């Protein structure tokens, strides 16, 4: 089994990535392979609504010059998906929005290849907005009929400066429990 996480923060090794790594640690303890893909510092455009993916059904977006098709294939091949985003103006970052729009559209055009995969949201926030960010990611998982594991609270950390997550004991516990629950759900759904 393999989980691929997409870090939507432009900050490499920032709080969002550190939260993902906490989840990864628990997944690895359960023998689940992990891979981190940094998308937050990339320039992706959103879906343009051309419906070419519905015509071609070739598992690709017609926009082929920005690396999103490689990301879509990573999502298709993974058993579990983590999408991490800091809160930007009360919601997900632009690269995460583009991933959601384009992967979701290509998946649905190709028999919904995301169906029944396990999906988890990871968010980092300074003060407010994490519920919208968390919900935006989970709405994506829900509309694609994915299985969403829970934790002991919403999957968020209160943090601003890089490394602040290390001071957020409750947030770290949430991500530890998310990793344990994600591993359990994946094993149960793949029996």
Feature map (PLM): residue ranges:
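Glycine-rich phosphate/pyrophosphate-binding loop and the adjoining helix
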Residues: 1, 8, 24, 29-30, ...
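Short beta-strand segments enriched in small/hydrophobic residues
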Residues: 2-9, 120-123
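N-terminal cysteine/histidine-rich coordination modules
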Residues: 5-19, 23
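Short, glycine/serine-rich, charged loops/turns that create anion-binding
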Residues: 10-11, 41, 126
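Short amphipathic alpha-helical segment that frequently serves as the phosphate-/nucleotide-binding helix
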Residues: 17-21, 134, 172
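A short beta-strand-loop structural module common to alpha/beta enzyme folds
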Residues: 32-42
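Cysteine-cluster motifs in flexible loop/terminal segments that predominantly coordinate metals
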Residues: 42-75
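Helix-loop-strand module that forms the ligand-binding subsite of alpha/beta enzymes
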Residues: 62-147, 153
């Amino acid at each position: 089994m393999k989980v691929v996480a997409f870090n939507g923060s432009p900050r490499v090794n920032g709080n969002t990535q550190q939260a993902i790594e906490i989840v990864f640690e628990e997944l690895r303890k359960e023998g689940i392979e992990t891979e981190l893909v940094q998308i937050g510092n990339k320039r992706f455009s959103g879906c343009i609504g051309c419906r070419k993916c519905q015509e071609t059904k070739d598992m690709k977006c017609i926009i082929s010059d920005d690396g999103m098709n490689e990301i879509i294939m990573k999502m298709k091949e993974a058993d579990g998906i983590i999408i991490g985003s800091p809160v930007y103006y009360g919601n997900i970052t632009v690269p995460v929005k583009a991933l959601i729009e384009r992967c979701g559209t290509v998946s649905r055009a190709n028999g919904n290849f995301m169906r029944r995969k396990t999906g988890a949201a990871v968010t980092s926030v300074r003060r407010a907005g994490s519920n919208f960010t968390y919900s935006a990611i989970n709405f994506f998982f829900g509309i694609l009929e994915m299985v969403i594991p829970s934790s002991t609270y919403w999957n968020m950390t209160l943090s601003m400066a890089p490394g602040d997550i290390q001071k957020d004991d409750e947030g770290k516990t949430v991500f530890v429990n998310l990793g344990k629950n994600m591993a359990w759900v994946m094993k149960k759904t793949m029996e």
